[in-house]
Amino acid sequence: MSLIVLGTASHVGKSMTVAALCRALYRRGIPVAPFKSQNMSLNSYVTVDGSEIGIAQAVQAFAAGIEPEADMNPILLKPKGDSVSQVVLLGRPYKDVQIRDYYRETDTLLAEAVSAFERLRSRFGNVVVEGAGGAAEVNLYDRDIANIRLARSLRLPIVLVADIERGGVFAQVYGTLALLPEDIRPLVAGIIVNKFRGDPGLFAPGVAKLEELTGVPVLGVVPFADIPLPSEDSLSIADKRDRKTGTPVRIAVVRLPRISNFTDFELLEEHVAVDYVPPGGTLSGYDCIILPGTKNTVEDLAALNRHGVGEELRLARERGVPIIGICGGYQMLGRRIVDAGIESENPAEYAGFGLLDVVTAFTGYRKTTVQVRRRATGPGPILPAMGEVDGYEIHMGETERGDLSEAFAGEGASTPDGLVFGTYMHGLFQNPGAANALLAYLAKRRGVAFEPVTAESTALGAAASYDDLARHFEEHVDMDAIMKYFIDRRSE
């Protein structure tokens, strides 16, 4: 069997709930797969076969002990700006669409999503489905293929997740249930109150009141837990709290308007202060500056130029501050970007920041999506110390390198001193070797002690984190009530 996890709003903990359920089933030896029909996120992941899906579904797949695949997130929307999103269908670029045009295709896309779900269910037996945003968006009911229309098609039991941390949990739950369509409301089998601060037992009267008001059982009150797993979307940036506020080493990640895959830096956040600095914020005083990925290189480059970021980068370069570009950030560090109307409406040529001798051309609607393993081969104090690294590429455009040294075998570029380099490789600094190489140099330059990164880590978190999440969830949720919705094929 299967169930659907819906939420009262965005960022209430649906993704973590699905990951926890997947891990809990995995720990019981029960096969399960995650599923989200439609995800809107700029944090994505590349599967073994080169399919692109939302990073949350990849996290959930690894929690379930299986490889991520396209059917787990058949529709991925990647906002490009001005109400335009790239639609990734079954792991491959489909087209760029205005939101109004997208809504005209929801019947077809829903059919694709249901087919993907059925393929997963036929193979795994159990599927944990995640909704999107808030379930009770009444103005979208006729085109909501991630919540209401999907629930209507699948007719699965629903668990509703609410976030008590932001306040108003009674209104969240009662209002959502009251607004659900009459044919959907009876499917709601339970409520989970998430992100409680303090002793959950103190909310016992609240549990009783919720059950009295709604007639739906509360399956658990889950305390807030700071378990290191990748973030799904840019809402998470605002919630980031410096875990290492006392460290003298500080890294600036330029918060691009269309920042993507900022999960690249979450391992670094565990060890030094990482600030996400918006355009217009100062970059002076940092030990390292990173330009991350973006869904629209041309538009975000223009935004940085409007705020004088290029001059700040040149001054940082004069001070010997390491400057690193990842994916779109790598493209921006080059001399020139030639766009044939792929990134913007009209063909044009744009000057980059000129710190790397590379030129990027967008000549066709082709996307590179591939997992990679490379050895760092560049010069200087950082790159040679990285060793072999794993990651993945997700990018439009092709970059030609001038006479500069390559940063990684066959890819990337570096200045002769190795203090400015760029790569298309996402997940670079999720490799402990790469993180140690950077942090050791920054600590030495700052004149402070360096504590190496030793924890097991992958691009999507350590297995221990998944286990911690499952244990935390199971401790506070009525698992007996939930387990009746899943089948154990071992007994068949």
UniProtKB/Swiss-Prot annotation:
GO annotation, biological process: cobalamin biosynthetic process
CDD domains listed in its UniProt record: CobQ_N (cd05389), GATase1_CobQ (cd01750)
Active site: 327 (nucleophile), 426
Pfam family, any one: CbiA
Record-annotated GATase cobBQ-type domain positions: 248-434
One of the record's GO molecular function terms: ABC-type vitamin B12 transporter activity
Residue stretches in coiled coil: none
Gene3D superfamilies assigned: 3.40.50.880, P-loop containing nucleotide triphosphate hydrolases (3.40.50.300)
PROSITE patterns tied to this protein: GATASE_COBBQ
InterPro entries: Class_I_gatase-like, CobQ/CobB/MinD/ParA_Nub-bd_dom, CobQ_GATase1, CobQ_N, CobQ_synth, GATase_3, P-loop_NTPase
The entry's keywords: Cobalamin biosynthesis, Glutamine amidotransferase
Pathway connected to this protein: Cofactor biosynthesis; adenosylcobalamin biosynthesis
Membrane spanning residue stretches: none
Family, per entry: Belongs to the CobB/CobQ family. CobQ subfamily.
PANTHER family, per database record: COBYRIC ACID SYNTHASE, DETHIOBIOTIN SYNTHETASE
Function: Catalyzes amidations at positions B, D, E, and G on adenosylcobyrinic A,C-diamide. NH(2) groups are provided by glutamine, and one molecule of ATP is hydrogenolyzed for each amidation.
Protein name listed in UniProt: Probable cobyric acid synthase
